[in-house]
Design a protein with these regions (language model features):
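Protein maturation boundaries and topogenic segments
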Residues: 1-103, 174-176, 180-208
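Short, surface-exposed secondary-structure edge patches
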Residues: 63-67, 82-85, 107, 145, ...
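Mid-length scaffold segments of soluble, non-membrane domains
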Residues: 103-107, 111-128
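Phosphate/adenylate-binding glycine loop and adjacent helical scaffold
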Residues: 157
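Active-site loop architecture of trypsin-fold serine endopeptidases
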Residues: 161-168
């Protein structure tokens, strides 16, 4: 006995179910392509956000010993100082003011308006001697003093006897701050949050 499809074929009518089946085959391909494109765009967007908000920095030299060692890799928070003001004790990555293509890493010691005095093996800010437990040995200083201008900072390396810093090239403009050092992600034995000392007044270090 002939089926309905047999009758349609014999009478020359097109068989509609076949077209519907073809459409069903093509639709999954379009969906897959769209999902691939959406995934690529989302990946690029996330990559852009991450690179805008953070940076990577490799410690070169010994100016931040013993806090940071040569060859360690850090994650830098580039947005930190859009949300808060830089503080004494913060470790930052900066553009070297005499050659902005080079980046240094130092610790903020003086804020705008601070009077910095160095002598007799100690740093004083506004007349108060700083407690600096992170220093690499006893520093030797030539007696000097400065007043930090507006929108500028006074930065020093933790390894005072082996550091090119504000004692040599003066104040750091705020516009030359790249970001706040946040995480040591390599080498493995030192992995963790970068220690910051708020106000440098003998308080315990704050990480992050």
């Amino acid at each position: 006995m002939a089926t309905v499809e047999d009758s349609q074929f014999q009478q020359g009518y097109p068989i509609q179910p076949a077209k519907a089946e073809a459409r069903q085959v093509s639709q999954p391909t379009g969906v897959i392509l769209r999902e691939i494109v959406e995934t690529l765009l989302l990946t690029l967007f996330i990559f852009w956000i991450v690179n805008t908000a953070t940076g990577r920095y490799r410690v070169q030299g010994h100016s931040m010993m013993p806090t940071l060692k040569e060859g360690e890799y850090l994650i830098i928070n580039k947005l930190s100082y859009y949300l808060e003001e830089p503080k004494r004790g913060d470790i930052i990555v900066l553009h070297y003011p005499r050659d902005r293509s080079r980046e240094y890493i130092k610790r903020i010691v003086g804020l705008p308006g601070d009077r910095i005095e160095i002598g007799n093996g100690q740093v004083k800010v506004n007349g108060t001697g700083l407690t600096e437990p992170y220093l690499n040995g006893a520093p030797t200083y030539h007696e000097q003093s400065w007043v930090v201008p507006e929108d500028s900072y006074f930065v020093l390396g933790d390894n005072r006897n082996n550091s090119s810093d504000s004692r040599n090239w003066s104040f750091l403009p705020r516009s030359d701050i790249v970001g706040k050092a946040s995480v040591i992600y390599w080498g493995v034995e030192d992995w963790g949050l970068v220690p910051h000392y708020p106000h440098l007044t003998g308080q315990s270090p704050v990480t992050g």
